[in-house]
């Protein structure tokens, strides 16, 4: 599931934001403020505060701003690159990552993409 979900996020980033980098990092975001927001979120996650980072992301993405969609997709891409031991120690799971991506896609009215991630969960 790890590889396929990362590939799916990479495909969505290419379709929506014309990002074709081999590895998706904060550097693919052109806007420096948005890049810093993503870095802050991934730093929280890297320190085991995934729930806190995800809550901040949720608040940001309620406004429908496409830049925040890009941040969200990259956040979950980063998170999905973590090993299972790290996720477990942070009280998080791959299923929660997939549900987060699905929820993000639904908030941006990307129902086809949300359905693809829903299928990936099952």
Where in the sequence are the language-model features?
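Helix-boundary capping/turn motifs
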Residues: 30-34, 45-51
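Amphipathic alpha-helical binding modules
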Residues: 73-122
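Alpha-helical junction/boundary sensor with strong preference for TPR arrays
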Residues: 12-19, 51, 63-65, 83, ...
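Residue-level signature for tetratricopeptide repeat
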Residues: 39-43, 47, 78
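Amphipathic alpha-helical repeat scaffolds
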Residues: 9-13, 38-42, 58
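Short, charge-rich amphipathic alpha-helical segments embedded
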Residues: 16-37, 59-87
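Inward-facing hydrophobic residues that define packing positions of alpha-helical scaffold repeats
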Residues: 5, 12, 50, 56-57, ...
């Amino acid at each position: 599931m790890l590889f396929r979900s990362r590939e799916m996020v990479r495909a969505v980033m290419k379709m929506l934001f014309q990002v074709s980098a081999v590895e998706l990092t904060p550097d693919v975001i052109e806007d420096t403020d948005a890049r810093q927001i993503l870095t802050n979120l991934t730093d929280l996650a890297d320190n085991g505060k995934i729930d806190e980072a995800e809550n901040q992301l949720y608040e940001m993405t309620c406004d429908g701003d496409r830049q925040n969609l890009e941040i969200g997709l990259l956040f979950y891409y980063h998170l999905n690159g973590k090993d299972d031991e790290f996720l477990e120690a942070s009280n998080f799971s791959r299923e929660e990552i997939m549900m987060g991506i699905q929820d993000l896609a639904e908030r941006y009215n990307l129902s086809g993409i949300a359905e693809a991630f829903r299928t990936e969960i099952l």
